Amino acid sequence: MPRSLFRTVLTALVAASCLIAAPALAKSRIKDIVSFEGVRENQLIGYGIVVGLNGTGDSLRNAPMTKQSLEAMLERQGVNVRDNNLNTKNTAAVMVTANLPPFSASGSKVDVTVSTLGDAKSLLGGTLLVTSLQGADGQTYAVAQGTVQTGSVSAGGASGSSVTKGVPTAGRIAGGGVIERETGFQMVNMDIMRLTLRNPDFTTARRVADAINAKFPGCAQAQNPTIIATRPPPGMDMISFMTNIENLMVEPDGPAKVVIDEVAGVIVMGDDVRISQVAIAQGNLTITVQENPAVSQPAPFSQGQTAVVPQSTVNVEEEKGKQLLTLGGAPSLKGLIGGLNALGVTPRDMISILQAVKAAGALQADIEVM
């Protein structure tokens, strides 16, 4: 093989090996880490009635609004029931909620959530009657109706015992809401579009602005850790501009954080969590108190009385074999977890240890307790 060809092949192999060994950067698309100004959902809410329940509806004593609503609805249908006794066991008053998607067109459908308002036991098999859904401005944007799907199962026996799986007092209607009014938001004539970072950070904001300016010079500026102001270049409308920039790749950054759920015993921490040099010792102390009541029997013919004498036994056990663990300065997440696992700690013990390390000033991260 000629020397020049050998040198070329060797150079190519070395370059390929470097590319394979190089760690991949955790980059994300801009549209996955920001929200566009005005492009958001709006919450809708309404009050309605579910009928067709199998005796699991509201009672007249605890839910008088159900009877009033039923009477008003029947009167609108031309039925006079003011002087008659109504049974609401097959009817339930409910609150209906939905999210109005951005740019939703009139006639499109959305899912709605139905939740009981009174003391109804279940919405299984019920049908929601026509219900208007209003926005925060009081305007009606959608109308909902349909069969409620609860996703729950109930079973009972003749003795009165029953088993319920799921939540039967709340359900959904897939495509049960029809959009009647549009929000009227338009992007075509906008001059400036502000991008809002979902996780505010100075570094990420600058990187987003740099990525946009690399493709469209002078069209983006980071105003603060949350907002990046953008302007389309001359001759380009806002829709085309957003289409071009939303798929640009950016490596997001953020402060080191440890999230703790004390109820479930869950700990979530990022790879950028660092810890200063610190020594950790952990031991479990178990205290057992056992009651052993004894009977005191008097001697014969002594005119004494039999009595119960309480006797308590207290045992204190401390787990042996635990060592003092020393973590060097700024170890990685792998080293931190490996060191804590070396102590044999459980996730719940690890929560207390991390909080103690943070209190000692050795944990270089924020702790967020859920």
From Swiss-Prot:
<dbReference type="GO" id="GO:0009428">
    <property type="term" value="C:bacterial-type flagellum basal body, distal rod, P ring"/>
</dbReference>
<dbReference type="InterPro" id="IPR001782">
    <property type="entry name" value="Flag_FlgI"/>
</dbReference>
<keyword id="KW-0975">Bacterial flagellum</keyword>
<dbReference type="Pfam" id="PF02119">
    <property type="entry name" value="FlgI"/>
</dbReference>
<dbReference type="GO" id="GO:0071973">
    <property type="term" value="P:bacterial-type flagellum-dependent cell motility"/>
</dbReference>
<dbReference type="GO" id="GO:0030288">
    <property type="term" value="C:outer membrane-bounded periplasmic space"/>
</dbReference>
<comment type="similarity">
    <text>Belongs to the FlgI family.</text>
</comment>
<keyword id="KW-0574">Periplasm</keyword>
<dbReference type="GO" id="GO:0005198">
    <property type="term" value="F:structural molecule activity"/>
</dbReference>
<comment type="subunit">
    <text>The basal body constitutes a major portion of the flagellar organelle and consists of five rings (E,L,P,S, and M) mounted on a central rod.</text>
</comment>
<protein>
    <recommendedName>
        <fullName>Flagellar P-ring protein</fullName>
    </recommendedName>
</protein>
<comment type="function">
    <text>Assembles around the rod to form the L-ring and probably protects the motor/basal body from shearing forces during rotation.</text>
</comment>
<feature type="signal peptide">
    <location>
        <begin position="1"/>
        <end position="26"/>
    </location>
</feature>
<keyword id="KW-0732">Signal</keyword>
